[in-house]
């Protein structure tokens, strides 16, 4: 979904590799392992402070210069929560010589908090709740930004077991719907 002209498709390890391979196959753009992950760094978006999230992202990934230099890159990630990771990876790829970085997200935009165990409890901390898609694209310094549609996400899995609250604000229990409306 959301094609663009590019030389290479890269997925953010490890959560976005399968989505990147799928995008590559559908678009005909070659897939490369253009990012290398330090396996000893935990998920960065769940760190307790912004400073710790930024430090974790800096230590977590490295770009493979020989695969991105002078190329237009499609970067596939599973989601954008606060934008910290996306901004750092776009900068990392451009510092490694990428001409352009087009970000494609394998989920709809996250615009609502999660009250079911994921560390994103307020709208204010969510990049796409505070900004339009165009503003979010500028904030992460990407050349373009697109999200998977809700419809496409629903087609890809078992609808009855998929919580969509963080994408559309429809919580499966009224307790959390009321909490959001306060």
Residue ranges, per PLM feature:
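PRPP-associated nucleotide enzymes
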Residues: 1-182
